Amino acid sequence: MASQGTKRSYEQMETGGERQNATEIRASVGRMVGGIGRFYIQMCTELKLSDYEGRLIQNSITIERMILSAFDERRNKYLEEHPSAGKDPKKTGGPIYRRRDGKWMRELILYDKEEIRRIWRQANNGEDATAGLTHLMIWHSNLNDATYQRTRALVRTGMDPRMCSLMQGSTLPRRSGAAGAAVKGVGTMVMELIRMIKRGINDRNFWRGENGRRTRIAYERMCNILKGKFQTAAQRAMMDQVRESRNPGNAEIEDLIFLARSALILRGSVAHKSCLPACVYGLAVASGYDFEREGYSLVGIDPFRLLQNSQVFSLIRPNENPAHKSQLVWMACHSAAFEDLRVSSFIRGTRVVPRGQMSTRGVQIASNENMETMDSSTLELRSRYWAIRTRSGGNTNQQRASAGQISVQPTFSVQRNLPFERATIMAAFTGNTEGRTSDMRTEIIRMMENARPEDVSFQGRGVFELSDEKATNPIVPSFDMSNEGSYFFGDNAEEYDN
């Protein structure tokens, strides 16, 4: 990206640091995941989980959700002011699964939030360690991205369900900070802005008074985050228009939807980080690995290496395919829900199938599901190669548009063409080029028309052997150019419901 110089790296955003050198970044990210690991071990001790139960991904998710809930200030305050029946605002909990006489049992646990916060701080040298909390939020967000499609949410805001590849991070909580903003897709930002504008249209006090001033600041900040994701001058200029509007309304919504569509070809830069379940960090810490001393990166070989040596289990429903369950979690671990399946398959070393062909539901088990028939199996989270995660949209040479498939947001920095159906996308751009943004719209459409699907993105970038930790010998894969590689293609995934 043109303006990369002023940006902090992911890891700095993730750890709340000022500009640091590579070694300091690796150390502070290591400190962050080490803290998560120590917290997890302590929780397993508190709950008296066996080694096997501690490696169960469902137990990991429950423990992660408890700590996130314990630190959710706004919700805690809300719960205390609006007491609801049967909800104790000072307690948090969830299902813990235990192995009893060859069967899995569900046990609902309840803990004081204060106690959970104490354990978390103790594991993090007495600090609140917000970076670690954000890291867990991003892992949950990546899991949701791989598991559910957001068709309904897209349609509700007037966007097209085919824009699902722009929806990375759509389930991240608002409090996820700069690290959270970095991983949000263009569609996610557009949807948040449209919701805001719609509230302003329906509620005339929304932009007024002291509260309205704060709302306005939030609106402009979100516009700037979205602007920073676009890589062409025309798209950025349109974002300036949207941000500066005196009274945001339908014209701004139109502009935002136009921009979201344009991002299918002129892709935005969206960060990708491999965030792993807490139990994986716990296993490593328990085996004596010192993350802070060794250093850690979310975008290099480290997460791949960690997954090579971790054995994680998952509960499996009667008619689910364990291999598909493994694929789902693998994609979540590497933030690869919107990556081209050809690239994912090559890196993973086994064929990655589209969502519609998978026989598996989500990882979490609902409280009304029957435990009698539950089995468990090992998740296969290893990979054949590793590759560097990208934060660019894979557009060829900075300012020019590159081909974008109707549903790919690249995760790995690996050379490939980005096949796309230009006719399908361009059909969405008929008509409306009048109004104050007409010259920008015309310019954007011209760039999109000039994009060629055969253009190669990430020229010369390849994958690496797992023994090649310094990334010295890139292996540039050759892909079947005609093969369309979208995960949500022809899909029947469940909708995401809060």
Swiss-Prot record:
SUPFAM superfamilies in the record: flu NP-like (SSF161003)
Main localisation: virion
Superkingdom field: Viruses
Motif Bipartite nuclear localization signal per UniProt: ranges: 198-216
Any one GO MF annotation of this record: RNA binding
Keyword NAD: no
Motif (Unconventional nuclear localization signal): 1-18
Region (Disordered): 1-21
UniProt-annotated location(s): Virion; Host nucleus
Keywords: Capsid protein, Helical capsid protein, Host nucleus, Host-virus interaction, Ribonucleoprotein, RNA-binding, Viral nucleoprotein, Viral penetration into host nucleus, Virion, Virus entry into host cell
Pfam families per record: Flu_NP (PF00506)
Membership in a protein family: Belongs to the influenza viruses nucleoprotein family.
Record function comment: Encapsidates the negative strand viral RNA, protecting it from nucleases. The encapsidated genomic RNA is termed the ribonucleoprotein (RNP) and serves as template for transcription and replication. The RNP needs to be localized in the host nucleus to start an infectious cycle, but is too large to diffuse through the nuclear pore complex. NP comprises at least 2 nuclear localization signals that are responsible for the active RNP import into the nucleus through cellular importin alpha/beta pathway.
Subunit annotation: Homomultimerizes to form the nucleocapsid. May bind host exportin-1/XPO1. Binds to viral genomic RNA. Protein-RNA contacts are mediated by a combination of electrostatic interactions between positively charged residues and the phosphate backbone and planar interactions between aromatic side chains and bases.
Protein name as catalogued: Nucleoprotein
Species per Swiss-Prot/TrEMBL record: Influenza A virus (strain A/Duck/Manitoba/1/1953 H10N7)
